[in-house]
């Protein structure tokens, strides 16, 4: 409010008059952008379907300079040692192929706790059709890591396209 009071004084009015005549106040910062660029956000772990932990590095398989084999790779938002696969699998139509194994989630959480994670992103294959495994995982995380931020891809970006879901969920978890 101090900033608005200074603004009102600068334009020769009172704060009450300024607010009365104002229909919208918009405030923008670069805090979120800086957290991503500087890698200074939360310590995030990623749980994903077993065998798919490298999707952040694989991206969509495309490179800006596709034939340049020496092109430097960008570091993924979440390092590989904090990206863990768990036993579960949904089919593309949303039916369960492999039931969620709570013991595998528990073991993965032990690893993330040991690595100091205070935020956990969860992105399972085909969870946009049926988020049950992600929701069950969230309950397990909250029981074991009650102070951790939990971010589910089925909440953030429930769409087809695995890389987009994983990367959006990872950014949100930062």
Which functions belong to the PLM regions below?
Residues 1-174:
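N-terminally biased helix-coil "hinge/interface" segments that flank
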């Amino acid at each position: 409010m101090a900033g608005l009071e200074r603004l009102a004084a600068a334009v020769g009015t009172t704060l009450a008059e300024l607010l009365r005549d104002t229909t919208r106040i918009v405030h923008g910062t670069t805090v979120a952008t800086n957290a991503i660029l500087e890698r200074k956000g939360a310590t995030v772990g990623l749980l994903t379907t077993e065998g798919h932990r490298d999707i952040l590095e694989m991206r969509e398989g495309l490179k800006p300079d596709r034939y340049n084999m020496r092109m430097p790779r960008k570091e993924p938002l979440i390092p590989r040692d904090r990206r863990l696969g768990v036993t579960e699998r949904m089919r593309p139509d949303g039916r369960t192929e492999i039931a969620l194994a709570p013991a595998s989630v528990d073991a993965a959480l032990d690893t993330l706790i040991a690595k100091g994670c205070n935020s956990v992103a969860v992105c399972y294959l085909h969870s946009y059709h049926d988020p049950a495994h992600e929701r069950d995982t969230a309950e397990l995380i909250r029981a074991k890591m009650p102070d951790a931020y939990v971010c589910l891809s089925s909440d953030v970006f429930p769409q087809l396209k695995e890389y987009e879901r994983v990367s959006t969920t990872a950014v949100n978890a930062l």
